[in-house]
UniProtKB/Swiss-Prot annotation:
UniProt GO BP: mRNA processing; RNA splicing; tRNA processing
Keyword Metal-binding: no
Pfam families membership: Intron_maturas2, MatK_N
One CC-aspect GO term: chloroplast
PANTHER family according to UniProt: MATURASE K
Family per similarity comment: Belongs to the intron maturase 2 family. MatK subfamily.
Protein name (database record): Maturase K
Lineage: Eukaryota, Viridiplantae, Streptophyta, Embryophyta, Tracheophyta
Taxonomic source organism: Kniphofia uvaria (Red-hot poker)
Cellular localisation: Plastid, Chloroplast
Function: Usually encoded in the trnK tRNA gene intron. Probably assists in splicing its own and other chloroplast group II introns.
Keyword terms, alphabetized: Chloroplast, mRNA processing, Plastid, RNA-binding, tRNA processing
Length: 521
């Protein structure tokens, strides 16, 4: 880490980012290896075939040795039969090396982004910790804004069809041309090489979960390009003239040219297309929120305005990124009768009507008031589907045992199930109807009991009778304990005592597979 920090300081002083020499540094691969593989709320850290932490240093050394060998990255295999192509050990090493190299690429590419972020904080004199926003901070924002809006567009941002699009978007911010060529070569070769290991029905290897880090980096660069022009037009809408011939600016030198051009001549892209859509951004009641591929665009305008926005996004992806996006990816609905799925919640607006009796002297009259309330509920069906995928229950929600954990100790089994249950309750603490979570807790509790009974070769009823209430105590969440401190005058909290309280835990800075809409679709 110290050597990496020295390199970052050196790169900051030179203002040039030569990244390709880092590919031959052993500590980069050690950092990628120590970073760990993917984990989620349901799955333990992914274990590659017979992977053992004790052999990590040997594997990293072996990887470096193979990297130094000539033509290692450009070796190709013509045999498409996996059994003939790779034995057990060969598949283990190739799978491991592919993952760790992709992780190393991601770590290296993140360097210029981290430098720019740190310099931005130093220039603006903003403490870094002020930028650490909770994911749950989105929902208080929606609570205050959506109640005054009419329509919402549910947008699913498409993946680029060709990886060259991802490399070109990254080229705007990474100035090391040899490294970009090597990255392009790496993506091309590894896509062809790993395509032999997957069926045609599965997604390409590069977009699989095993390469989540580098995929997230490149995809976020692509999404940033999608949103960059939208944010620019929104901020500058009141400064732009209605008639203009415009000037095309190269995105590679965007930040340098913006300092020398007056704002009235600053029109970023195609004058044949974007000058027709600038008036969209003059609507002050337009709100845009995104997480990963899912975006929400809400407006106080009419259905016609939202329809214009829909085709604006479709044309933007087509002309700027050169790929076709199907219009059905964007759904337009009225907020009063529509529930949209976002960040693991089903959100909607509830209309509350109330009558107030007002009396002035001898006259009295009733005043009917209608207020909108932002409502969030737990998507039980989607949670059960994720539990079924993780082998905790059947598709219908019937709890089953977890045989893969039967070899663990009783305390480890209870701790794993309890941790999953507490994390779920922690994340969905902002739900307005927490009774739905009790079914999920019941599934996990009974699945834990079935796993323990399977381990001890006993029935669930006999095991629960012997264990008593100790198993239930492991599934009490921290939420009841926090609420008992906040509201001490209330009656003691039980398992069902806090279903009316909505609390957004602002210490949540990462989420799990449950909130990823693609994993639940």
């Amino acid at each position: 880490m110290e050597e990496l920090q020295r390199y970052l300081e050196k790169g900051r002083s030179r203002q040039q980012h030569f990244l390709y020499p880092l590919l031959f540094q052993e500590y980069i691969y050690a950092l990628a290896h120590d970073h760990g593989l993917n984990s989620s709320i349901f799955y333990e850290p992914v274990e590659i075939i017979s992977y053992d932490n004790k052999s990590s240093l040997a594997l990293v050394k072996r990887l470096i040795t193979r990297i130094y060998q000539q033509n290692y990255l450009i070796s190709s295999v013509n045999d498409s039969n996996q059994n003939q192509f790779l034995g057990h050990n060969a598949f283990f090493y190739s799978h491991f090396f592919s993952q760790i190299i992709s992780e190393s690429f991601a770590i290296i590419v993140e360097i210029p982004f981290s430098l720019r972020l740190v310099s931005f904080f130093e220039e603006k004199e903003i403490p870094i910790y002020h930028n650490l926003r909770s994911i749950h901070s989105i929902f208080p924002f929606l609570e205050g804004k959506l109640s005054h809006l009419n329509y919402v567009s549910d947008i699913l941002i498409p993946h680029p069809i060709h990886m060259e699009i991802l490399v070109q978007t990254l080229q705007c911010r990474v100035q090391d041309v040899p490294f970009l060529h090597l990255l392009r070569f790496f993506l091309h070769e590894y896509h062809n090489w790993n395509s032999l290991l997957i069926t045609q029905n599965k997604s390409i290897y590069f977009f699989s979960k095993e390469n989540k880090r580098i995929f997230r980096l490149l995809y976020n660069s692509y999404v940033f390009e999608c949103e960059f022009l939208l944010v620019f037009f929104r901020k500058q809408s009141y400064y732009l003239r209605l008639t203009s011939s415009g000037t095309f600016l190269e995105r590679t030198h965007f930040y340098r040219k913006i300092e020398h051009l007056p704002i009235e001549h600053f029109f970023v892209v195609c004058r044949n297309y974007f000058h027709r859509t600038r008036w969209f951004f003059k609507n002050p009641f337009m709100h845009y929120v995104r997480y990963q591929r899912k975006a929400i665009l809400a407006s106080r305008g009419t259905h016609f305005l939202m329809k214009k926005w829909k085709y604006h996004f479709v044309n933007f992806w087509q002309y700027y990124f050169h790929f076709w996006s199907r219009p059905y990816r964007i759904h337009i609905n009225h907020l009063s009768n529509y529930s949209f799925y976002f960040l693991g919640y089903l959100s909607s607006l509830l209309i509350n009507s109330s009558a107030v009796r007002n009396q002035m002297l001898e006259n009295s009259f009733l005043i009917d008031t209608v207020t909108n309330k932002f409502d969030t509920i737990v998507p039980v069906i989607l949670l059960i589907r994720s539990l079924s995928k993780a082998k905790f229950c059947t598709v219908s929600g019937h709890p089953i045992s977890k045989p893969i954990w039967a070899d663990l100790s009783d305390s480890d089994i209870i701790d794993r199930f309890g941790r999953i249950c507490r994390n779920l309750s922690h994340y969905h603490s902002g739900s307005s109807k927490k009774q739905d979570l009790y079914r999920i807790k019941y599934i996990l509790r009974l699945s834990c009991a079935r796993t323990l009974a399977r381990k001890h070769k006993s029935t669930v009823r006999t095991f629960l009778r012997r264990l008593g209430s100790g198993l239930l105590e492991e599934f009490f969440t921290e939420e009841e304990q926090v609420l008992s401190l906040i509201f001490p005058k209330r009656t003691p909290f039980t398992l069902h005592g806090s279903h009316r309280e909505r609390i957004w835990y602002l210490d949540i800075i990462c989420i799990n597979d449950l909130v990823n809409h693609s994993x639940l679709s």
